Amino acid sequence: MGPFGALCLAWALLGVVRACPEPCACVDKYAHQFADCAYKELREVPEGLPANVTTLSLSANKITVLRRGAFVNVTQVTSLWLAHSEVRTVESGALAVLSQLKNLDLSHNLISNFPWSDLRNLSALQLLKMNHNRLGSLPRDALGALPDLRSLRINNNRLRTLEPGTFDALSALSHLQLYHNPFHCSCGLVWLQAWAASTRVSLPEPDSIACASPPELQGVPVHRLPALPCAPPSVRLSAEPPPEAPGTPLRAGLAFMLHCVAEGHPTPRLQWQLQIPGGTVVLVPPVLSKEEDGGDKVEDGEGDGDEDLPTQTEAPTPTPAPAWPAPPATPRFLALANGSLLVPLLSAKEAGIYTCRAHNELGTNSTSLRVTVAAAGPPKHAPGTGEEPDAQVPTSERKATTKGRSNSVLPFKPEGKTKGQGLARVSVLGEIEAELEETDEGEQMEGQIPADPMGEKHCGHGDPSRYVSNHAFNQSSDLKPHVFELGVIALDVAEREARVQLTPLAARWGPGPDGASGARRPGRRPLRLLYLCPAGGGTAVQWSRVEEGVNAYWFRGLRPGTNYSVCLALAGEACHVQVVFSTKKELPSLLVIVTVSVFLLVLATVPLLGAACCHLLAKHPGKPYRLILRPQAPDPMEKRIAADFDPRASYLESEKSYPARGEAGGEEPEEVPEEGLDEDVEQGDPSGDLQREESLAGCSLVESQSKANQEEFEAGSEYSDRLPLGAEAVNIAQEINGNYRQTAG
């Protein structure tokens, strides 16, 4: 037993050693198996790892893809470290087998799409590190199966928003890192502000959980967001034409339109869901385009052959069709950019439930309408009878079919904005929008235009039976009642639109097939068409069927300053009445603004310039003068007066102590010779001469200025008996009575 047991032990140890791959180091400590494969430059998860490994470190490698089944043999792993491993892709199901996983580190990688569904099997997970990746979204239910998760780190990613209630299922969460994500702070993120203020979860760096957009909130922390005007969507659904009563079937062959109006903030996104006999159809309206040159928004779409996919024509000005009369196939449904849904031709195939769904960041709302279509009946007249369809229709039924058109104008509400009385829409580039009349060939004409409706003979240079040219209405926007044989009136020609009105037509409308004007087409009413063509010829730009009871038609999307012609004809025949007109030239709005601004600027500047010139002329002197001061030779008398009245000399004399008359024996004090004073001055500093000259010049200037005042002149004159300030009567006692002493010049 001893040798056999030792052999078994050696074999077991050898098996364990062989179970660890060569680049990795496997260590068994504390009843846990550690597999260290970090910093080995591995490109794949190594195979042959021990089945009982509990901690697997694959950090700092080059494993770009975590493939499905990579951990199928190590299902007992509780800690998986994959940081800094350049992981880009995690295949779905790669982590789902690790049901005992508690710690998962996928930080500092390049993961943009993560299989969040794998976390549903990791109910024991306690630590999840997904920071420093490229995650762009976090589904609301991604963390719903992690009740034991304590630490979640999803900072430094590309998260722009978080769904409300994302962290509600994390009852054990105590640490959450959300900072350094480019959050879009809108109504969808308001809940995070309230949650962060009330939660007990630790949120490091709250000021770094900030907004990256919109620009006005960039850099604002989420917990300091201002109040935002938010409202969930509300939906209103209406039909045109509206049903007379709920559940009333609509007549087949009508053009049916549903208008869906959704309100909310942010602006809700719309979606149509149609439950029709052929199945369920989902339509998403196109994004509303910006206003074009003419200021009109795109309203109508044009099919591209697919019955269920809506399309939209975005050309501001219609272009001639490449080939006529082959029109493009009309789609069954058109989802318009303004939220409306158009059914060009209603039939039993379009009956069903129409649902408009609106969604924004705060929720979803929807409303539905059931549409029923009446079954098509037999023909209302026998072929070859020569009777019109409406001749045998009862009066009550005829009134019901023409309800709302008693004023001979079909109400029309353009998409977006409506002004004044509406007109019947005109088809653009072969698009059928007018209601099809019921004829004996109605079943064959559904979704098609009449054969050869706009050939070259309608808009070319051929000789029609009658050609009328009228340009009078171009000179004014007033109605010009120029009535022609078939009653054509053109009015309100603008830069990009023209309205054409037809007077009531006579019973015998146009010639018959044999050319006789009095003949009537046997079996059916003649199909009347209205074309808009370039005046120089070519294929028609727009056309419309002349409907019974509709006498006004609106041509839009025209080119400014272009010649057009309106042609009134029968189907398949040449033009019988043609009116030529020109659209007005469009004056650029910028030019008008600049012109008016320049005019107002000139009007306001000219008076100011005139006033400024008058002010300058009034202030301008007649002859300029300049004051010139020239030095003059000092006058001897002025020199003497300046010496006698020198305040410094007076001050020196006052400081001397004179003896009393009695004590001095009545002797007069000796006078200091003036020559001695002059010599002292001359022997002094040369700067004294300069100061003396400056003082003399100043005295002369003062005297010249004092001449204007007689009193000042007398005070400064040598003939004045007033004593200057500082002079003593003792020194000038001899000169009081006019006994002036002559001094040597």
From Swiss-Prot:
Pfam families: LRR_8. Residues 290-300 have a biased composition (Basic and acidic residues). Disruption phenotype: Sensory and motor neuron axonal projection defects. Residues 20-589 are extracellular. One of its GO terms (cellular component) is plasma membrane. Residues 317-328 have a biased composition (Pro residues). Residues 20-51 form the LRRNT domain. LRR repeats lie at residues 52-73, 76-97, 100-123, 124-145, 148-169. Homomultimer. Interacts with NTRK1/TrkA. Residues 290-328, 376-423, 654-697 are annotated as: Disordered. GO terms for biological process: nervous system development; positive regulation of axon extension. At 11.5 dpc, expressed in spinal nerves, their roots and the ventral spinal cord. At 12.5 dpc, detected in the ventral spinal cord, dorsal root ganglia (DRG), dorsal and ventral roots and sympathetic chain ganglia. At 12.5 dpc, expressed in almost all motor neurons which also express RET and in almost all DRG sensory neurons which also express NTRK1. At 18.5 dpc, expressed only in a subset of NTRK1-expressing neurons but still expressed in nearly all RET-expressing neurons. Residues 611-745 are cytoplasmic. InterPro entries: Cys-rich_flank_reg_C (IPR000483), Ig-like_dom (IPR007110), Ig-like_dom_sf (IPR036179), Ig-like_fold (IPR013783), Leu-rich_rpt (IPR001611), Leu-rich_rpt_typical-subtyp (IPR003591), LRR_dom_sf (IPR032675). It comes from the Eukaryota. Residues 181-232 form the LRRCT domain. Glycans are attached at residues 52, 73, 121, 338, 365, 474, 563. The modification Phosphotyrosine is found at residue 719. Residues 233-372 form the Ig-like domain. The modification Phosphoserine is found at residue 720. The chain crosses the membrane at residues 590-610. Keywords: Cell membrane, Developmental protein, Disulfide bond, Glycoprotein, Immunoglobulin domain, Leucine-rich repeat, Membrane, Neurogenesis, Phosphoprotein, Repeat, Signal, Transmembrane, Transmembrane helix. This is Immunoglobulin superfamily containing leucine-rich repeat protein 2. Required for axon extension during neural development. Disulfide bonds join 260-356. Residues 665-683 have a biased composition (Acidic residues).
